[in-house]
Amino acid sequence: MSLNQDQVFQYEREGYVFPIDVLTPAEVATCRESLEAAEMESGGKLPPAYRAKSHLLFKWLDDVIRDRRVLDPIEQLIGPNILCWNTIFWIKDASSESFVSWHQDNTYWGLSSDKVVTAWLALSPAQTENGCMRVMPG
């Protein structure tokens, strides 16, 4: 999987590019099932301690972050030698009042490099009703 020139230009101009379909619907469903199984093992909700750096806890997620279909587009944007600094589960049900205020990931995280990419993988439909992600160009 690679980005076309229009997608690369959009990223350079706007700071984001989406959607990039990297996993099949069946693979996404398997990821969701794995997450839901982990939630059930934890009593119905994934504990906060399991929601960050989750690729260190769940082999299936570690496999996703190492998948060439995920890494190749990122490499096109920031170059090789990619480090996955964090993975986060932001689990938000429809009509939930939880939110994340506007922010810039690179500034928010306090990392020293400007070669930072957020690769967001939706495991459920992203709709207005459940507070889908919004991006601001630039």
What is each model feature region?
Residues 1-111:
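Non-heme Fe(II)-dependent double-stranded beta-helix
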Residues 98-138:
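Catalytic core of non-heme Fe(II) oxygenases with the double-stranded beta-helix
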